[in-house]
Curated annotation (Swiss-Prot):
One Pfam family this sequence matches: tRNA_m1G_MT
Lineage per the UniProt record: Bacteria, Bacillati, Bacillota, Bacilli, Bacillales
SUPFAM superfamilies (UniProt xref): alpha/beta knot
Enzyme Commission number(s) from the entry: 2.1.1.228
The organism's place on the tree of life at top rank: Bacteria
Record-given protein name: tRNA (guanine-N(1)-)-methyltransferase
Keyword Transcription regulation: no
Amino acid sequence: MKIDYLTLFPEMFDGVLNHSIMKRAQENNKLQINTVNFRDYAINKHNQVDDYPYGGGQGMVLKPEPVFNAMEDLDVTEQTRVILMCPQGEPFSHQKAVELSKADHIVFICGHYEGYDERIRTHLVTDEISMGDYVLTGGELPAMTMTDAIVRLIPGVLGNEQSHQDDSFSDGLLEFPQYTRPREFKGLTVPDVLLSGNHANIDAWRHEQKLIRTYNKRPDLIEKYPLTNEDKQILERYKIGLKKG
């Protein structure tokens, strides 16, 4: 996969993209990273990339010329996913990360200021994505967050494919509780089932815990999840247990 970032602050990406999984993905030729400062593509002597909005209003708007010019230097095809980070976009999700992990080429347009000239949005962009109902100073941090979520799903990046298959959201539920050594710590013990060696019982316990954890923390996900009759019985027993205290 190749990822290009159009940004006014390419140095922001160094710390995140040159360590841990991102670094290994590049070393193993699973990922190619390129940052482009679109200020270099400004058309006046002051390298101006923003201007006042037509019709008045607060803040500055990113001009179309630098972004369009920068895009012309990228090897963009009809299959390239050009992503605009903006609050009005589709909320980012694990499902979106899975979809994007199958792309060969992604371009992130990371803006600043009040917004983008609408012609950037309508003529260059394939996907508008939001990280949530809040506003950040720029698109760099969301782009890096998305990159981490996407790249770890590329086959061969994590080494153990089961690693991301057990993650929260991979099957629509939150992840089950995890434990490691020591068996007892400050009077807190690991559930016996995890030490039993009975993998069928362990899998059943983990699924039950995923259902209960999701029910408690993300009931919206439970509403979307295709509960089996057994799942419904698990949750019903849990609710009865809560009432009994």
